[in-house]
Amino acid sequence: MASFGVRGMGQPLGIRICCCRVCTCINFGFVLSRIGLLKLMQLGLAMLCEGLLIRYGVPYADSIGQALTSFLATTGHCFTTTGILLLCYAFSDKSYSLIRQSLFETLFNGLASCMYFSSSSYMGFACVVWLHPQFLVRPGFWAYPAMTACYYMGYAAGILHALDAYLAFRHFRGAR
């Protein structure tokens, strides 16, 4: 049975299979840590939002308007940057110690939180004003429930990024 190695004193990284270790370049200790799980949740919410926006929002872009563009830009930006950070942190302890203590993490997560709250509010307005009346009269109009779920998940992603900004700021200030 494979056991996941975590970074500890004298314990190597990777997956232990029988008498050898494979994938020693991956730091599973980070991926399963509090910050790693927070990054994974941010990625998951961004991926779900992006999928819903493309599948159900793009066909009704005329009805939704700029709220769709705003939300797509927010999820795309946050998904890409969070994914790159997660990859860097999972493959390099040095990257984690250098980037996490810099001001970049705090500013990125603070900006991402503001962008998610802003675009979610705009999407909520678009849902109530333009999509809900169509949902009441057109059977099988799935854009309204999908976009509603999207802006709810956007608020959740904004909260996660705000929490990550707070934790990054504490790390920046020296509290580990």
UniProtKB/Swiss-Prot annotation:
Induction remark = By Mef2 during myoblast fusion in developing muscles of embryos and pupae.
* GO BP: any one term: myoblast fusion
Q: Which GO terms describe its cellular component?
A: membrane
Topology in the lipid bilayer = Multi-pass membrane protein
Please describe what happens when the gene is knocked out.
Answer: RNAi-mediated knockdown in pupae is adult lethal. Pupae develop to the pharate adult stage and die before eclosion from the pupal case. In pupae, fusion-competent myoblasts (FCMs) fail to fuse with the muscle founder templates. Pharate adults display adherent muscle formation; only partially developed dorsal longitudinal muscles appear to be present but they are smaller and their nuclei are reduced in number and clustered together. RNAi-mediated knockdown in embryos reduces myoblast fusion.
Please classify the protein's predominant subcellular localization into one broad category.
membrane
The protein's location, in the record's own words, is: Membrane
What range(s) does the MARVEL domain occupy?
30-173
Q: Which UniProt keywords apply?
A: Membrane, Myogenesis, Transmembrane, Transmembrane helix
Q: Where are the transmembrane segments?
A: 13-35, 71-91, 111-131, 140-160
Domain of life here? Eukaryota
This molecule's function is given as: Essential for myoblast fusion in developing embryos and pupae, and consequently is essential for muscle formation in adults. Required for progression past the pre-fusion complex stage of myoblast fusion.
State any further remark.
Named 'singles bar' based upon the accumulation of single myoblasts in mutant embryos.
Protein name from the UniProt record: Protein singles bar
Protein's organism: Drosophila melanogaster
